[in-house]
Amino acid sequence: KPICDAVANHPKRRNFIATHPIAGTEFSGPSAAIKGLFKGKTNIICEVEKTTFKLQEKALELFKEMGMRIRYMDPKSHDKHIAYVSHLSHISSFMLGKTVINKEKDEQDIFDMAGSGFESTVRLAKSSPAMWTPIFKQNKKQVVKTLEEYIANLSNFKELLVNDDYEAIYSEMQNVNKIREILNGMNAKK
């Protein structure tokens, strides 16, 4: 939303198309380019009605050539949803990495004991702070909301553990396992 707001009154606003390709890695810069990165990925387009039809056609042709799926969304919805599925993932990864680095002062212990689960969970902690700090700043309101919910879920899990309520822990994890079908559905669309 802040980007759309920033260009709202620009005299050439109709020559701007607000897009957010949902694709990337933890690396940044030209050396991190990956051929085919956008193939099968979603590209969110906001406020398409404010862009000239000719530019829309050109952009859609380019996105189609890249193999992207298009999803139209208003900027507020984009910011809300992206805070859950992207921003929170990055924060979780950064903070898990911080927790382990602060606790495990011996790097060899981390190296020897960390398996693929840990590696995949902290992969995003390798992301560029120069890129992510402004993202968190721009979407602060939504990021704070998602963090509050996430922290409440972590606190609830901790409480269940403290109270030896392993049935509830099992049930929580079983309910969250539904994410598997969602992710499998995403992968099937690619």
Which ranges hold each PLM region?
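Alpha-helix N-cap/loop-to-helix initiation residues
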Residues: 26, 51-52, 143
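Rossmann-like NAD(P)(H) cofactor-binding subdomain of soluble oxidoreductases
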Residues: 1-31
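Conserved strand-to-helix beginnings and helix N-cap segments that scaffold or border functional pockets
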Residues: 4, 53-57, 147
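Internal alpha-helical scaffold of NAD(P)-dependent oxidoreductase catalytic cores
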Residues: 35-123
